[in-house]
């Protein structure tokens, strides 16, 4: 039986949004308290990652990202570290993702190939056949490397924007009510800062991949799509 695929919106809600709201709004002494609030917020991505591991046989990237992000934010708040560390943390998350995207090129499972050049989107057997016929297998590898650096660049941009956004918004000492309110504002703004440029560049990379494949295979766009997408388009 095929495992259910991770739902990105549900993952985002459970692993990032709900924990962030708990940290910023319910970790004060009048509600949960600092330590209990931190532990409750952290429990959401942990439980969701365990659920993914049991049901889908994978931990889920967003759940892991949520855990790391909430854990680091909570540590900064609980131990009242200087707010500069929060700016570093907010920049570090997308920066590390971008580095991971590039490093994955040296592994058997490049992330861009897994995300964009896969059988869910494309008819890989037909594409491979045409690439071999046209002697363009090397060219498609070069195309995937270029698209990898495009996507990694989007995360670098997000890291820079996140750093300055955090420095601008969070100015109160950690452990104060003002810090928690500013953290809530940051949460509301920081993920669009990550998501919007990354999504835009992802679409550009996807367009570049599709355009390159049609050129290298000599097939029209409709022919390179997976059977599943062809059925949906009817």
Regions found by a protein language model. Give the residues of each.
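Short, Lys/Arg-rich, polar N-terminal cytosolic tail immediately upstream
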Residues: 1-7
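Lipid-exposed faces of alpha-helical membrane segments in multi-pass integral membrane proteins
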Residues: 10, 14, 18, 40-47, ...
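Structural signal for membrane-spanning alpha-helices in multi-pass inner-membrane proteins
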Residues: 19, 23, 52, 73-77, ...
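Structural signature of hydrophobic alpha-helical transmembrane segments
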Residues: 29-43, 62-63
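C-terminal ends of transmembrane helices
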Residues: 47-56
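Long, highly hydrophobic alpha-helical transmembrane signal-anchor segments
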Residues: 55-103, 174-182
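Membrane-proximal helix-loop-helix units in multi-pass membrane proteins
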Residues: 85-141
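C-terminal membrane-adjacent module
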Residues: 120-224
């Amino acid at each position: 039986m095929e495992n259910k695929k991770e739902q990105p919106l549900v993952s985002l809600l459970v692993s990032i949004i709900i924990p962030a709201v708990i940290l910023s709004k319910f970790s004060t002494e009048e509600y949960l308290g600092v330590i209990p609030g931190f532990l409750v917020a952290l429990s959401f991505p942990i439980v969701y990652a365990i659920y993914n591991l049991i049901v889908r046989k994978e931990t889920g990237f967003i759940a892991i990202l949520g855990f790391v992000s909430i854990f680091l934010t909570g540590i900064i708040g609980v131990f009242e570290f200087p707010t500069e560390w929060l700016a570093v943390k907010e920049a570090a998350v997308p920066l590390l993702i971008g580095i991971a995207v590039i490093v994955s090129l040296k592994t058997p499972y490049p992330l861009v190939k897994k995300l964009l050049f896969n059988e869910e989107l494309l008819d890989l057997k037909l594409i491979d056949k045409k690439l071999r016929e046209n002697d363009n297998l090397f060219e498609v590898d070069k195309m995937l490397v270029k698209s990898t650096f495009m996507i990694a660049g989007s995360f670098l941009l997000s890291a820079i924007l996140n750093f300055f956004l955090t420095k601008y918004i969070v100015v109160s000492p950690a452990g104060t009510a003002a810090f928690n309110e500013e953290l809530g504002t940051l949460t509301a703004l920081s993920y669009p800062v990550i998501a919007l440029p990354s999504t835009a560049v992802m679409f550009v990379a996807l367009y570049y991949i599709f355009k390159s494949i049609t050129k290298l295979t000599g097939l029209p766009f409709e022919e390179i799509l997976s059977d599943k997408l062809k059925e949906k388009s009817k």
